[in-house]
Amino acid sequence: MIDRYKHQQLRIGSVSPQQISAWATKILPNGEIVGEVTKPYTFHYKTNKPEKDGLFCERIFGPIKSGICACGNYRVIGDEKEDPKFCEQCGVEFVDSRIRRYQMGYIKLACPVTHVWYLKRLPSYIANLLDKPLKELEGLVYCDFSFARPITKKPTFLRLRGLFEYEIQSWKYSIPLFFTTQGFDTFRNREISTGAGAIREQLADLDLRIIIENSLVEWEELGEEGHTGNEWEDRKVGRRKDFLVRRVELAKHFIRTNIEPEWMVLCLLPVLPPELRPIIQIDGGKLMSSDINELYRRVIYRNNTLTDLLTTSRSTPVELVMCQEKLVQEAVDTLLDNGIRGQPMRDGHNKVYKSFSDVIEGKEGRFRETLLGKRVDYSGRSVIVVGPSLSLHRCGLPREIAIELFQTFVIRGLIRQHLASNIGVAKSQIREKEPIVWEILQEVMQGHPVLLNRAPTLHRLGIQAFQPVLVAGRAICLHPLVCKGFNADFDGDQMAVHVPLSLEAQVEARLLMFSHMNLLSPAIGDPISVPTQDMLIGLYVLTSGNPRGICVNRYNPCNRINYQNKKRSDNSHYKYTKEPFFSNSYDAIGAYRQKRINLDSPLWLRWRLDQRVIASRETPIEVHYESLGTFYEIYGHYLIVRSLKKQILFIYIRTTVGHIALYREIEEAIQGFSRAYSYGT
């Protein structure tokens, strides 16, 4: 069993047959070696006990019940005085039943079998190392054709057949008879190679360092040739150079990890521990079995048949042996990756069997569901909505979620303040949602950040820390500026919330993970907190000066008459000076709150003289004179009030309440940053 305190990482790769045997083989106290699964059976239909040497054998994988052997005898586990440590009658050790979760077995294959991941997955590692087409290797693995072994300076039967086949026609009838004689096995093993054994021999003969040297030389030669002018030839050369680079990298990986290429062909097939492929009894006495058990049974049946053909029947036709080897290869392929070669294998109900690949890959696989993405305590999940009134470092947490996440902290607060005598009373107060509970919850949440995570977490900005705030409803409120880091929007996205418990986790959340500490992309340094979606629409509406709004089109036939009537009315009554004048922005916003003006209504706002920017060459649109001698020069976006001596008395700019509100927000933000900078220096 893996000790979580001693092992910090897990490496997945190819292993040698010796390593597989070491994992699965164990020596009993009487010296007997067990570990090989030879029978395709699971449980006996009468006794309901595991079959000996089967897929659930207690001798191989350990007892089903701790300290109880297959005979029913009991021994105390860990007692040094208990002797013997195993049952001499059934051969089952008196150990903890948890051994069945990690004790492996193995199947000794009657013929080598290629691992389908290394053959069929793209890129094909076997095809890359051997520098041969994948279709050719597939035909060899599945016994569609054979190749002759290179035997130099020796006459071979294949050469003789090639010489005499066309000279002596009678040999055409005598040669096939030779392939069915008893001596053909010796000839076949000497001169003919097919199946995964042929692949294994070629991989074993490879020298990885020579492959690297030859590939580099060929790559340099192709680079020296340059462009030929033929687009098709240039693409062919480019693909060849890319292939050579992949081949060199693959060979270097094998050398660096001390992996032999022939390990990609299996001689021993590991058998998973029984607890990882269980058989469960459901209501009514029916049994539910993992699909992997059925696939293992299929492999054992075919492997035993091939063993019988090779050992007992010496006169078996070679075509039958090759066909059975192909069936064993296909059975192992289905066990490892069902459907990788085409149509997947199905059961009697036309349901596809779940192979080993299906068990470990994907969102519901062993890694993502039970190891990486498993459910944890002190976490929740809900839909996110926009929180326009939130600060950048805050998030709105629904009361229902908050009271569950911080329940233990609230209980401790109630007991410390003597508002509850024990845990039971505190839980009762929480269930009844007494007002004091929400006060304690507010105190607890003030100094405790939470972590928000949106799957998939592709980079560090996928999980950030926030200061929680209680909100009504059942949705998590989020500031729209942090959406880009999460790659989130408000169309139904869900986010998970976690509570950091340890002091180290809380310090890390405050110093490194708070949203206002992650304003720039860690990858390229660009701003990550930029307005998007709702904020862009809001800024457009806020600064839009069109009195007709952004959704009305005056060129629409339905709106043309209304627009013409409004234009005619404006020409008769509308004057620039009829628009309201305000001496400061506070008066303008106050008038808007009193509903005397609209958000996009044009108005005149007095501007400070030291901040004016006036184009000297611009001519006024209109000039209005008053009886006292003062006059107004009206331009496109501003108005100047001059005295009788043409001195500037006031300057008014033409704006809207939306522009004023945006300007004040920017001004306050800049002033706040300046104060913070001055305090820091």
UniProtKB/Swiss-Prot annotation:
Reactions listed under catalytic activity: RNA(n) + a ribonucleoside 5'-triphosphate = RNA(n+1) + diphosphate
EC numbers on record: 2.7.7.6
GO CC annotations on file: chloroplast; DNA-directed RNA polymerase complex; mitochondrion
Signal peptide: none
Residues reported to bind Zn(2+): C69, C71, C87, C90
Key words of the record: Chloroplast, DNA-directed RNA polymerase, Magnesium, Metal-binding, Nucleotidyltransferase, Plastid, Transcription, Transferase, Zinc
Pfam family, one: RNA_pol_Rpb1_2
Keyword Transferase: yes
Listed HAMAP family: RNApol_bact_RpoC1
Known role: DNA-dependent RNA polymerase catalyzes the transcription of DNA into RNA using the four ribonucleoside triphosphates as substrates.
Protein name from the UniProt record: DNA-directed RNA polymerase subunit beta'
Taxonomic source organism: Nicotiana tomentosiformis
